[in-house]
């Protein structure tokens, strides 16, 4: 591990923050990431850029050294040679590099090497973390090849998430919000990251897993569309089943895509809303009927939960018929037929 170009400026009153990026043979895109990081508005924030170079055999390290020589923030680098790293393990290593650089106190943000944070990204993420424990920012594709089906898919899931918050409102949600969590734009405090055990060593989906774990632990997850990172719509990515893989699949056989049935999702969202109210009032009779559990069982679960978020995530099951999948076209029609869905969309 090495720190290149440490700053001597006083950082005592600024919020310590680490931008954590896993890098694997990204020489083609690192210059645009570095340029974007240099443009970040950082008033009141003491950022540092933490780069985990995972089995790189291109010019990535040379580019990092060239950038760090004149960077306006500390650049901290760790190289891992010939590793068995997958997406989750590499991102976790990048986050732990950031953790060590912060001495265990501050904010960890993560993005990807092919991403370009908006100028106000740091400020927006920090503002979000004043209201929540985890902030999942919005990822906007840099469109070099149109994909109307993916546009429809994203619009559907945004409308579905709006339905969720109309049926199960929480006061920490972003306004505007969006539907997903991506490692290209995610932030939380060091203590929160440690409490969750970090990103799991998964080949893909490590970001969604961390956010699900956070909600089940009772942490407030804020999906905030004002925290924006632009990312590549390249078709050749570093992660199996990542965005690049999704784009290739849609290019090839997109009309066959299926999505969550909004009727089943709405059933679960309503249950979450009922569970929150039951937890707040310590009155579990109506919830017991809805989820087919005994009042004694619900009281016991509530006793072990730190707050309503954790309780709702634990006690509301999947719908009686399971979480079905339907075609995107059918799902769009079904969502529009749900009264709260019409308002949400």
What are these regions (language model features)?
Residues 255-345:
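Terminal low-complexity segments of carbohydrate-biosynthetic enzymes
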Residues 155-178:
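Short, flexible, basic/aromatic active-site loop/helix in glycosyltransferases
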Residues 120-153:
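Conserved donor NDP-sugar-binding/catalytic core segment of glycosyltransferases
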Residues 204-210:
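Acidic donor-binding loop at a coil-to-helix junction in glycosyltransferase catalytic cores
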Residues 35-46:
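Short, acidic, metal-binding catalytic loop of nucleotide-sugar glycosyltransferases
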Residues 81-102:
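Glycine-rich, basic loop-to-helix element that forms the pyrophosphate-binding segment
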Residues 102-116:
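Short beta-strand-to-loop acidic/aromatic patch adjacent to the donor-nucleotide binding site
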Residues 53-63, 115:
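A conserved acidic beta->alpha catalytic loop
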């Amino acid at each position: 591990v090495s720190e290149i170009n440490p700053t001597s400026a006083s950082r005592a009153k600024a919020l310590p923050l680490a931008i954590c990026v896993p890098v694997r043979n990204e020489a083609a895109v690192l210059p645009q990431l570095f340029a974007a990081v240099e443009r970040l508005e950082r008033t009141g924030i003491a950022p540092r850029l933490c780069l985990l170079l995972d089995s790189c055999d291109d010019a990535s390290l040379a580019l990092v050294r060239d950038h760090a020589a004149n960077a306006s923030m500390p650049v901290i680098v760790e190289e891992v040679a010939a590793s068995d790293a997958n997406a989750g393990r590499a991102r976790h290593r990048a986050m732990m590099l950031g953790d060590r650089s912060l001495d265990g106190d501050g904010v960890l943000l993560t993005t990807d090497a092919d991403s370009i944070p908006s100028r106000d990204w740091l400020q927006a993420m920090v503002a979000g973390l004043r209201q929540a424990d985890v902030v999942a920012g919005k990822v906007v594709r840099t469109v070099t090849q149109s994909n109307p089906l993916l546009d429809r898919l994203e619009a559907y899931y945004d409308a579905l998430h709006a339905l969720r918050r109309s049926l199960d409102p929480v006061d920490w949600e972003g306004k505007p919000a969006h539907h997903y969590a991506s490692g290209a734009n995610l932030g939380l405090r060091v203590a929160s990251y440690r409490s969750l055990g970090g990103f799991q060593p998964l080949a893909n989906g490590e970001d969604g897993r961390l956010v699900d774990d956070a909600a089940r632990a009772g942490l407030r997850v804020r999906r905030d569309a004002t925290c924006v990172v632009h990312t590549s719509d390249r078709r050749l990515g570093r992660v199996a089943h990542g965005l690049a893989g999704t784009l290739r699949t849609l290019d090839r056989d997109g009309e066959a895509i299926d999505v969550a049935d909004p009727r089943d999702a709405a059933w679960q969202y309503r249950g979450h809303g009922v569970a929150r109210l039951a937890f707040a009032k310590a009155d579990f009779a109506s919830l017991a009927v809805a989820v087919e559990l005994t009042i004694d069982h619900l009281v016991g679960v509530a006793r072990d939960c730190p707050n309503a978020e954790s309780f709702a995530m634990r006690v509301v099951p999947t719908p009686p018929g399971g979480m079905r999948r339907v075609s995107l076209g059918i799902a769009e029609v079904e969502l529009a037929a749900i009264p709260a869905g019409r308002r949400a969309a």
